Amino acid sequence: VLSLLTGGGGNANYWHWLFDVLPRLFLAKQVINLEEIDFFLFPSLDQKFQRETLDILGIPIKKRLSSRYYRHIAANKIIITDHPYILKNNPIKEIEDLPLWISEWLKESFLKINNKSEVLSKKFYIDRKDSSSNHTSLRKIINEEELKKFLKSKNFDIISLKSLTFANCVQLFNNAEFIIGLHGAGFANLSFCKPSTKIIEFRITPGKMYENLAKINNLKY
C-alpha cells in the first residue's frame, strides 16, 4: 500500500490535492515501480477533480482506497514519502517557498490533456460564488458586482472554476493571457500558465504562496 495521506486540506481542497497529495506519486516513483503497488491510500476520493486527476495519471479505480471509508488498514508493506515541500516543520514559511519541481511535474503530467481546438477565454475573472471553502465568508469583495461589471466592460469573462472539469481548468489557464481573482485554491492552476501571463490576486491575508508560485513560473504577478 502506498500512503498518500496528508493534512486535512487534502480531503477536499484543490490546492492541497495538487501540491500536498499528488506529488507524492512522483516521489514514490523514484524508488518503486507504481505498477507494483497493490493499493493507493488517499485522504478522500469524494471530489470530482480528485477522480479526474487520478484517471489522467492512470491510477486504476480498483487500486484506489479512500481513508474516509478505510479508517484502518493492515498490509505486508506500507510505503510513505516525505511531504513534498514541508521538510522543516515550518509550514507557514515553506508553503510560500514552493519548489519548482512540483509545478514542472504538474505541467508534465497534465498539459498533455490540453485540447487546443476549443475556443477559450484569454482574459477572465475567477468567480468564487460556488466555492465550498470554509473561508468563503472571510474572503469576499464587498463591491464584487461593481468589479464584475467593470471587468466585463474590459472584455473579461466571469468564470466559475467549479463548473469546469479538471481538464477544462488546465486548458483554460494554459490558454490565458490575463487572470484576476480573489485569493483561493483556484490559483493552484497558475502552474499551468504560460510564461508572462498577467496575474492580479486580491488578498486580505499576508500569505505569498500564489505570488511566489507565479514568480517561479515566470508569470507577471
Regions found by a protein language model. Name each.
Residues 1-221:
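The feature primarily captures lumenal catalytic ectodomains
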